Curated annotation (Swiss-Prot):
Entry superkingdom: Eukaryota
Keyword Nucleotidyltransferase attributed: no
Compartments reported by the entry: Cytoplasm, Perinuclear region; Endoplasmic reticulum; Golgi apparatus
Protein name: Probable trafficking protein particle complex subunit 2
GO CC aspect terms: cytoplasm; endoplasmic reticulum; nucleus; perinuclear region of cytoplasm; TRAPP complex; TRAPPII protein complex; TRAPPIII protein complex
CDD domains reported for this sequence: TRAPPC2_sedlin
Coiled coil: none
Single biological process term from Gene Ontology: endoplasmic reticulum to Golgi vesicle-mediated transport
Keywords, sorted A to Z: Cytoplasm, Endoplasmic reticulum, ER-Golgi transport, Golgi apparatus, Transport
Keyword Cell cycle appears in the UniProt entry: no
Family membership: Belongs to the TRAPP small subunits family. Sedlin subfamily.
Biological role stated in the UniProt entry: May play a role in vesicular transport from endoplasmic reticulum to Golgi. Involved in dsRNA uptake.
Amino acid sequence: MSTYYFVIVGQNDNPIYEKEFSTVNKELRKEDHRHLTQFIAHAALDLVDEHKWKTANMQLKSIDRFNQWFVSAFITASQIRFIIVHDNKNDEGIKNFFNEMYDTYIKNSMNAFYRINTPIKSPMFEKKSEIFGRKYLLS
């Protein structure tokens, strides 16, 4: 069983997009589980900002840990932060997922009808995140 909570955080610490990937059956999942992962991701924002100055890499592996949850992050050149809260180690899968989602985010950002730093509501973006989540995180 593995669970991943993915969130894209804007420049003003506002959530732009969020998605949960899980192999756990929906009936077995607890409702407060979602609030916990959101809280962990929000609490890790300061650590992400701290770590981004210490490395030239865009990807930050396991920057924080809370009980059984790990936090991994990816920072774009425009200071948009991709954060994954996960309960098992999968560094290679997370790296590939971040790279694919970054590419998808760039394509979405180039859309003339999308304003940077606003919530992403594109059905294609949602579909691609679902595909990449199943491919890299849940396989």
